[in-house]
């Protein structure tokens, strides 16, 4: 049927959703005005249209994106797909700030099963994008955080501008870098993946290109013309995309500010405790600021994120997404971790940083040094048998 199907014959991993996709004859069936899907020439164009919420992803948006991509994947008249975000003043200027974390908080407190559906379907969408058989172009102008990275890092071309701000800031709210973050961060040079996962460091265009999180740099003023020109390309020509790129891209701004030697020296150390000891012994401003930033985050989830990145280096994309699906289940539903439902680090982090905004998260444990391996290990035990995993159908 499609790549979300279970080849073992045990059924689709997203059985209900896939049944709905099979009924699709157009895009209006999701009734999701927050995704604009249109065809011009041989290109399927997608626009995230929730600018007042920084284009944060909702479950209807994820379903609409998935429906469009599945339909266009199998349509011989569609040669490529392009995606952008709607800004406050029109197209571009903003890509996607991630998932709707206020919804996460409300759903977790209510025990709403829709939260489970959200992450299963979001991660399946991430896999679909990474494995998409046609060119998928992401116009990553403005904010590209969390879930925004999830729908752009698998792109054939990842285009950034002088306004781009890329990051995986999940540890700030007591989460971990999900949406395939374990996979794409762990494959960066040196210990950059550990650094970005733990600190949530935000990158501009130059550093993003230098680290391999973006491919091409366009000045923002060139985006409307570049977007429109895709519809006029002769996609049967072997050099169509190369010609298009040559007409619009510039060299990415040179960037000498990435502290890569320090990143490798500290974030390649064997444990989070060792990283902290080394950072706090270094009198440099960078080391001091980095240590202070880490001390503000959930000690437990910093340990989990470090373990996640290091495990992911040996995993395929599908294996990583299954691991992340396990992790996110543990983050929001904590009974199996011998923690009460109200002691979820993620729920507490969202409360402190987003809901109440008191910035006084009550992390448990409160200190990095008090986290034990026995606290971290259960996060990496799947709550599902392999034949019942919600992402078992990912190949």
Model-derived segments and spans:
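Contiguous mid-protein beta-loop-alpha structural module that forms a pocket-lining wall or clamp
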Residues: 180-183, 187-235
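A structural preference for short, pocket-lining loop segments at secondary-structure junctions
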Residues: 41, 46, 64-109, 128-139, ...
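Gly/Pro- and small hydrophobic-enriched strand-loop and loop-to-helix capping segments
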Residues: 155-178, 212-227
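Amphipathic alpha-helical blocks and their helix-capping loop/short-beta junctions
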Residues: 213, 218-297, 301
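Glycine-rich beta-to-alpha active-site loop
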Residues: 87, 129-173, 196, 200-201, ...
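Conserved CoA-thioester-binding segment of acyl-CoA-metabolizing enzymes
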Residues: 23-84, 390, 395
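C-terminal amphipathic alpha-helical interaction region
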Residues: 341, 345-395
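An acidic, glycine-rich surface segment that forms the CoA-thioester-binding/catalytic face
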Residues: 101-140, 181, 378-385, 391-392
């Amino acid at each position: 049927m499609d790549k979300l199907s279970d080849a073992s014959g045990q059924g689709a991993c997203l059985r209900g959703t896939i049944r709905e996709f099979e009924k699709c004859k157009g895009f209006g069936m999701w009734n999701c005005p927050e995704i604009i899907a249109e065809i011009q020439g041989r290109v399927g164009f997608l626009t995230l249209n929730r600018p007042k919420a920084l284009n944060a992803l909702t479950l209807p948006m994820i379903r609409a994106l998935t429906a469009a991509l599945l339909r266009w994947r199998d349509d011989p008249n569609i040669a490529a797909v392009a995606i952008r975000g709607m800004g406050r003043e029109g197209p571009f200027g903003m890509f996607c700030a991630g998932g709707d974390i206020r919804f996460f908080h409300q759903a977790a407190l209510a025990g709403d099963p829709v939260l489970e559906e959200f992450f299963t379907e979001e991660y399946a969408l991430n896999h679909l994008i990474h494995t998409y058989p046609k060119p998928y172009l992401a116009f990553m102008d403005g904010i590209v955080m969390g879930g925004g990275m999830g729908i752009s890092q698998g792109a054939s071309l990842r285009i950034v501008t002088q306004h781009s701000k890329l990051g995986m800031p999940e540890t700030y709210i007591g989460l971990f870098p999900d949406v395939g973050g374990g996979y794409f961060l762990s494959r960066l040079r040196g210990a950059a993946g550990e650094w970005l996962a733990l600190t949530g460091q935000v990158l501009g265009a130059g550093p993003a290109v230098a680290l391999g999180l973006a491919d091409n740099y366009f000045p923002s003023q060139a985006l409307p013309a570049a977007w429109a020109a895709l519809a006029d390309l002769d996609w049967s020509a072997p050099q169509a995309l190369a010609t298009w790129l040559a007409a619009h891209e510039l060299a990415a701004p040179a960037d000498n500010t990435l502290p890569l030697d320090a990143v490798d020296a500290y974030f390649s150390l064997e444990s989070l405790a060792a990283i902290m000891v080394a950072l706090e012994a270094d009198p440099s401003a960078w080391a001091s600021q980095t240590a202070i930033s880490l001390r503000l985050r959930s000690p437990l989830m910093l340990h989990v994120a470090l373990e996640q990145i290091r495990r992911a280096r040996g995993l395929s994309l599908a294996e990583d997404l299954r691991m992340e699906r396990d992790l996110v289940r543990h983050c929001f539903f904590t009974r199996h971790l011998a923690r009460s439902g109200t002691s979820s680090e993620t729920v507490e982090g969202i409360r402190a940083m987003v809901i109440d905004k008191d910035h006084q998260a009550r992390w448990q444990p409160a200190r990095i040094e008090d986290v034990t391996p026995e606290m971290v290990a259960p996060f990496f035990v799947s709550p599902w048998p392999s034949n019942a995993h919600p992402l078992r159908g990912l190949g």
